[in-house]
């Protein structure tokens, strides 16, 4: 139900023309002075529990009337507040019940404008800060109108030895940047993050002006990095025992469970109308996977069930001013795994395993991660030794946040973050223990004749693909010679012939290396060798080989290795072709491979930006 409450000098209405849904015997003309006018729309989802919605609405109206010291109340049906209305019968029943219950208190004079009539009205709003209020009433939990719990937050740092420390002892370095942000003492930093310029100058990603803000166009060099990262997560999840699925990007808000889950995210959604159905674009893959789990026949001996989807795309309607580069988008790619566990003991075990995946992703991306563990006080008191064990296994200090009560679907979670070039966290991998969604979506199994709604783990082993690339680019700010891990480099080897007579040899070598699954291109442009070498450096190519007479005669290649180089001091090694192949394969061992996404001859390569 949607309410718009207006503190009015006066409200006057007059019924003009009835519709097919019109109430019989209306009061055709009426009004009130010094009143609280309650414009009301009853929604389709309210029909799940009309009594509960009415009770919540009455409580909200009474609360506002008390704040404003108002005794006159006028209930005004106003369909324009919602695009997903209930049946007329349900609406009349709800409006009549609200009117009746308010009258029964004996504290108010209550009137109700007729339902199903076109009406003209005049209203004067008082214009003070509380004179215009809007409320959304959610059936069932009543989350929209319940008083918010007073939740306190306690922070401390736990070291791998299990000792507890004050946060003030850990305010330096990357971990210190996370601590300062979480406890609210980080100093504001101006300017764009470093990656915003890099993503364009390296021809990875660009803004798409013809789309909504926060939607990007992926260029070939960026597309291959994105696809390799997606391959990486898929391989990781498959090795872990996950089962890939694919689910829709849009969902019907008429489904109560979906409506309630979506409503927790407030206005950060893309909502639209499809015929008579009120729809939304997903902001995570939860909806589809929970729907699959709800329809499954689950036996205790099949648990845990680990379900995975690369959510391409998920959508969040972030504030325009908050959208920036690859860090905060309105459309993004999220590797999303949900694990249905037997019980809490099973959930804790899966949590440990999935946290290891998160730490491993940082190692494989050559990006240092720092962590914060969050949980309710009740959880911490019960599982303190377990918390100490996961910090010990992580081998680094972790910030601990203790919430006095549960305010989300999770009772415990860990967030791992990279730190950008300006000292700001980029939250990436996460694991969460969800104790709410299996009940909401009716995901269950039976044990000893009892229905069990088990805990569900939410896990993104890497965080969004876009934020991974953001972290990789930001990481270069701390490198003396900026580079991506070799397995992610759009071009892994670049061949630079000195003269035209060397091009044929270089071309044959290029073919051989590409067949060996090494992304290799050939700079056959009519430019100086010096310029070609400089541009290979600007492209962050890990291995650069200049080919002249000596290379053709001896077969020995002078390879500049970027990872071992220093500014103005290139590291060079003499290698034959097989040694080169072994070197590159060793540096990319165990990582996914894709062939070149750009033309291998640079003379034919277009510029994208």
Swiss-Prot record:
GO terms for cellular component: cytoplasm. The keyword Protein biosynthesis applies. Its main location: cytoplasm. Keywords: Aminoacyl-tRNA synthetase, ATP-binding, Cytoplasm, Ligase, Metal-binding, Nucleotide-binding, Protein biosynthesis, RNA-binding, tRNA-binding, Zinc. InterPro entries: aa-tRNA-synt_IIb, aa-tRNA-synth_II, aa-tRNA-synth_II/BPL/LPL, Anticodon-bd, Anticodon-bd_dom_sf, DTD-like_sf, Thr-tRNA-ligase_IIa, Threonyl-tRNA_syn_edit_dom_arc. It is found in: Cytoplasm. Binds 1 zinc ion per subunit. GO terms for biological process: threonyl-tRNA aminoacylation. Its cofactor is Zn(2+). SUPFAM superfamilies: Class II aaRS ABD-related, Class II aaRS and biotin synthetases. Zn(2+) binds at residues 286, 338, 458. Residues 1-145 are annotated as: Editing domain. It catalyses: tRNA(Thr) + L-threonine + ATP = L-threonyl-tRNA(Thr) + AMP + diphosphate + H(+). Residues 194-485 are annotated as: Catalytic. It holds the Pfam family tRNA-Thr_ED. GO terms for molecular function: ATP binding; threonine-tRNA ligase activity; tRNA binding; zinc ion binding. Its EC number is 6.1.1.3. It comes from the Archaea. Belongs to the class-II aminoacyl-tRNA synthetase family. The N-terminal domain is an archaea-specific tRNA-editing domain that hydrolyzes incorrectly charged L-seryl-tRNA(Thr). Catalysis of tRNA editing is performed by the charged tRNA itself. Catalyzes the attachment of threonine to tRNA(Thr) in a two-step reaction: L-threonine is first activated by ATP to form Thr-AMP and then transferred to the acceptor end of tRNA(Thr). Also edits incorrectly charged L-seryl-tRNA(Thr). Homodimer. HAMAP family: Thr_tRNA_synth. This is Threonine--tRNA ligase. It comes from Methanosphaerula palustris (strain ATCC BAA-1556 / DSM 19958 / E1-9c).
């Amino acid at each position: 139900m949607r309410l718009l409450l207006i503190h009015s000098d006066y409200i006057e209405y007059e019924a003009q023309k009835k519709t097919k849904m019109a109430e019989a015997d209306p009061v055709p003309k009426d009004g009130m002075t010094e009143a609280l006018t309650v414009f009301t729309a009853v929604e389709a989802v309210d029909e799940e529990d009309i009594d509960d919605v009415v009770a919540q609405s009455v409580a909200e109206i009474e609360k506002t009337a008390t704040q404003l010291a108002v005794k006159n109340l006028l209930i005004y049906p106003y369909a324009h507040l919602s695009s997903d209305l209930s049946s007329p019968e349900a609406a009349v029943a709800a409006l009549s019940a609200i009117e009746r219950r308010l009258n029964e208190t004996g504290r108010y004079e209550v009137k109700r404008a007729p339902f199903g009539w076109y009406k003209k009205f005049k209203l004067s709003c008082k214009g003070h800060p509380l004179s215009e209020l809007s409320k959304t009433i959610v059936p069932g939990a009543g989350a929209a109108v319940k008083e918010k719990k007073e939740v306190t937050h306690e922070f401390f740092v736990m070291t791998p030895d299990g000792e507890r420390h004050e946060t003030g002892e850990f305010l330096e370095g990357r971990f210190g940047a996370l601590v300062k942000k979480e406890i609210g003492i980080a100093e504001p930093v101006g300017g764009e993050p470093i990656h915003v310029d890099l993503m364009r100058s390296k021809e990875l990603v660009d803004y798409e002006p013809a789309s909504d803000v926060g939607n990007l166009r992926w260029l070939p060099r960026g597309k291959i990095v994105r696809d390799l990262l997606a391959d990486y997560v898929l391989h990781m999840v498959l090795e872990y025992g996950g089962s890939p699925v694919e689910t829709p990007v849009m969902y019907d808000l008429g489904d109560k469970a979906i409506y309630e889950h979506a409503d927790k995210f407030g206005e950060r959604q893309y909502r639209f109308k499809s015929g008579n159905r009120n729809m939304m674009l997903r902001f995570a893959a939860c909806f589809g996977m929970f729907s699959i789990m709800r329809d499954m026949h689950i036996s205790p001996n099949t648990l845990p069930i680990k379900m995975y989807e690369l959510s391409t795309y998920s959508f969040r309607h972030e504030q325009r001013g908050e959208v920036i580069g690859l860090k905060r988008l309105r459309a993004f790619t999220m590797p999303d795994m949900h694990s249905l566990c037997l019980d809490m003991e099973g959930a804790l075990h899966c949590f440990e395993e999935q946290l290891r995946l998160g730490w491993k992703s940082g190692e494989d991306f050559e990006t240092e991660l720092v962590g914060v563990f969050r949980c309710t006080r009740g959880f911490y008191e019960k599982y303190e030794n377990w918390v100490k064990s996961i910090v010990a296994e992580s081998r680094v200090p972790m910030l601990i946040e203790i919430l006095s009560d549960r305010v989300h679907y999770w009772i415990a979670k860990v967030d791992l973050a990279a730190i950008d070039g300006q000292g700001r966290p980029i939250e990436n991998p996460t694991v969460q223990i969800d104790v709410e969604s299996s009940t909401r979506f009716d995901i269950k199994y039976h044990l000893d004749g009892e229905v069990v709604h088990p805990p569900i783990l939410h896990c993104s082993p890497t965080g969004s693909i876009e934020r991974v690339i953001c972290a990789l680019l930001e990481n270069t700010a701390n490198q003396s010679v900026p580079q991506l891990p070799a397995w992610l480099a759009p071009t892994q080897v670049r061949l630079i012939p000195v003269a035209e007579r060397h091009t044929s040899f270089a071309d044959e070598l290029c073919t051989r290396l590409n067949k060996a699954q090494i992304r290799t291109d050939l700079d056959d442009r009519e430019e100086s060798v010096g310029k070609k070498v400089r541009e290979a450096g600007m492209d962050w190519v890990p291995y650069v080989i200049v080919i002249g007479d000596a290379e053709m005669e001896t077969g020995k290649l002078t390879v500049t290795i970027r990872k071992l180089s220093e500014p103005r001091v290139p590291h060079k090694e003499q290698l034959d072709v097989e040694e080169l192949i072994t070197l590159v394969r060793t540096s990319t061992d165990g990582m996914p491979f894709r062939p070149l996404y750009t033309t291998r001859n640079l003379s034919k390569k277009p510029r994208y930006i």
